[in-house]
């Protein structure tokens, strides 16, 4: 995958409803730099819906360079290492972010 849109489509294709059981949250993605954009994923009742734009009240916000997000979604960059290196900045419910990875794997 080479674009942010492709990365987001790939993420949504891997959504596992069983792992999202009991989750009611909104995850905001702010991808910066060339090819960047903003999306939010609403997760509720075992379903996930991706929407371009900004959520007025996200549970978690992810700030990341677009290429780093593409690399994370493509399996080229480990999200934990990206977080530890400061490439992936997360605000809000960190516990949810731990589950987020398993919901979309």
Predicted regions and their residues:
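Feature captures hydrophobic
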Residues: 1-105
């Amino acid at each position: 995958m080479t674009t942010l849109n492709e990365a987001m489509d790939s993420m949504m294709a891997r959504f596992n409803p069983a792992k999202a059981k009991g989750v009611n949250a909104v995850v905001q993605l702010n991808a910066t730099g060339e090819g960047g954009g903003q999306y939010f994923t609403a997760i509720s009742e075992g379903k996930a819906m991706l929407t371009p734009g900004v959520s007025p009240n996200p549970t978690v916000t992810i700030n990341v360079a677009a290429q780093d997000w593409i690399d994370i979604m493509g399996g080229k960059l480990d999200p934990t290492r990206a977080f530890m290196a400061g490439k992936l900045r997360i605000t809000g419910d960190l516990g949810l972010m731990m589950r987020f990875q398993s919901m979309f794997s």
